[in-house]
Amino acid sequence: MATYYKDRFKHAANISKDGFSISKVECKELDIIGIYRSQDGNVQDLIKELKDLIDSRKTTVIGGDMNICVLRKPNNYVTSSLKEMGFQQIVSKATHIDGGIIDHIYIAQGENVKLAWNLEYFPKYYSDHDGLGLTTWLVE
């Protein structure tokens, strides 16, 4: 997994376990966590690592290829665990060539700032996944 970010962000963590990788960048207003989870990646271990990274007081965006379809399994362990922590899953259209939503984006509004967002889908001829483009801005 590669993470690209602007100068106002700083790299906070990289975690690589058997079956998943996590990268976190942060700035004063926002934490962003990127994930790749293979089909065999342990979801309990993934959530445990995320709980250690998430600051519940801070607005946080989590996104990545979870390899779990929220259309087929809307109450899967990852989605239900993140919902319990105050996250909302915002991807609503298929992101995979087979028609599933296996690429997720979760947002939790913290005490510090509130975000508004726009999500765009970018079909790619060279991949079985659509690209997702998330634009965010602060709401006053």
Describe these PLM feature segments.
Residues 1-3:
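A basic- and aromatic-enriched beta-loop-alpha substructure that forms the phosphate/nucleotide-
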Residues 5-86, 90-97, 111-140:
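Active-site regions of metal-assisted phosphoester/phosphodiester hydrolases
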Residues 106:
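Nucleotide-cofactor and metal-assisted catalytic machinery
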